[in-house]
A protein has these predicted regions:
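Function-dense linear segments that define catalytic or interfacial modules
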Residues: 120-205
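Conserved "right-hand" nucleotidyltransferase catalytic core of DNA-directed polymerases
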Residues: 1-144, 157-159, 166-169, 229, ...
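Short, hydrophobic beta-strand segments
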Residues: 1, 219, 223, 303, ...
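Hydrophobic, well-ordered secondary-structure elements that form the walls
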Residues: 43, 129, 164, 197, ...
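Conserved catalytic core of nucleic-acid polymerases
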Residues: 118, 124, 198-331
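Substrate-binding beta-hairpin/strand module that engages nucleic acids
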Residues: 188, 193, 208, 263, ...
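C-terminal structured "cap/appendage" subdomains that terminate the fold
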Residues: 322-370
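Short, contiguous acidic/charged loop-to-helix segments that flank catalytic cores in large enzymes
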Residues: 107-110, 162, 182-184, 207, ...
Length: 370
């Protein structure tokens, strides 16, 4: 298997990104005094002085070691609301990471004989059961990754076919909780994020704005990862009280979901572990802890494991069934990459329509939801 990587394309992208990095650096430096003419924007210590001493911006939080003030992505994002330079630094860091982590390192993994990259997948690195990719990690290409993806090429007369499970974790959540609102939304192909937003803002779904829908989306996905009023208030830049109101409205809107989550927690307290739909077990030792922080973390782990773990198993079973079906039909196609809820196949042009239909049929029939 493996994926062909066009070195020339990647080198061209690297050159363009390098030019953008250099321009961004110069634009930042021009707005500072001469003492910062050679500042290292990747140095937390130098950034700390620039942001909190020179620019006199408010320090938001300490580092994990509590020896200095943090300049991480979360801090820069907050500071960007009151000053433009932190936003420029964020962009600089994103591009620098793209260059150092992907554009330069990917070339080292290209097989000189085949011009292909072969990633390594692990079944056990992620506690929820998801597959993980390493050497190189092809599951974690960032937002600017569309540039990098253009360097991946199919073999002659072949095409790439992408198949992505739509909102698989929310659909799994609907099935496991049997929440009437969630089930109705997915059965009738409604906009679940707009439905949530309508409940939050006491409006008809048709009147929901794109900004309101984004809030609904943030809460829908956040609930899978233990969304708190504190986290939501920071994410949306709203008061803690309003964030708490949003969460309360969500819980009253999705009654069966709330009851199901409580039952998962109680079951975990009793057994000491949680299980996915396919009986994959994960122990949650902190679920009976009196320490509030440990207990809250354990609750998030319990819910997330059941939902994300079940979704991961569905994808894996889909991969197994699809591989068998491709071989049975003798199609000129093969899976070359799994990116969590998405499968990438390389398919001969002559088989593309038949394989597209096969992929849809196989992946949608992994579980009998009835």
């Amino acid at each position: 298997s493996g994926i062909i990587l066009d070195k020339n394309v990647l080198q061209d992208i690297n050159q363009r990104v390098t030019q953008e990095i250099d321009k961004l650096y110069k634009d930042i430096i021009l707005q500072l005094n001469e003492s910062y003419s050679s500042i290292n924007l990747n140095s937390p210590k130098q950034l700390e002085e620039l942001l909190f001493v020179h620019l006199n911006l408010p320090a938001i939080k300490k580092t994990a070691q509590r020896t200095s003030y943090s300049t991480d992505h979360e801090v820069l994002k907050e500071l960007s609301k009151i000053h433009h330079i932190p936003k420029m630094i964020m962009r600089y860091r994103e591009l620098f990471k793209l260059k150092s982590t992907y554009l330069e390192s990917l070339l080292d993994y290209v097989n000189s004989c085949t011009n292909k990259i072969h990633t390594t997948f692990s079944q056990t690195s992620v506690t929820t059961g998801r597959l993980s990719s390493s050497e190189p990690n092809l599951q974690n290409i960032p937002v600017d990754g569309f540039l990098i993806r253009s360097a991946f090429k199919s073999q002659e007369d072949n095409l790439f076919l992408s198949a992505d499970y739509s909102q698989i974790e929310l659909r799994v959540l609907a099935y496991l909780s049997q929440d009437k609102v969630l089930l109705d939304a997915f059965e009738k192909d409604k906009d679940i994020h707009a439905i949530t937003a309508a409940g939050l803002f006491d409006q008809d779904q048709e009147t929901i704005s794109s900004e309101q829908r984004q809030i609904g989306k943030r809460i829908n996905f956040g609930i899978l990862y233990g969304l708190t009023a504190h986290g939501l208030s920071k994410e949306l830049n709203i008061t803690h009280s309003l964030a708490n109101d949003y969460i309360k409205k969500f819980m009253s809107q999705y009654v069966q979901l709330n009851q199901w989550m409580e039952s998962v927690i109680e079951d975990a307290k009793s057994k000491g572990y949680v299980e996915t739909l396919f009986k994959r077990r994960r122990y949650v030792p902190g679920i009976n802890e009196k320490n509030k922080n440990i207990f809250e973390l354990s609750k998030r782990i319990a819910i997330n494991t059941v939902v994300q773990g079940t979704a991961a198993e569905i994808v894996k079973l889909g991969m197994i069934n699809l591989d068998k079906a491709i071989k049975k039909n003798n199609f000129n196609a093969k899976m070359i990459l799994q990116i969590h809820d998405e499968l990438i196949l390389e398919v001969n042009k002559s088989d593309i329509e038949k394989v597209s239909k096969l992929v849809k049929d196989v992946l949608e029939s992994v579980v009998d939801w009835n």
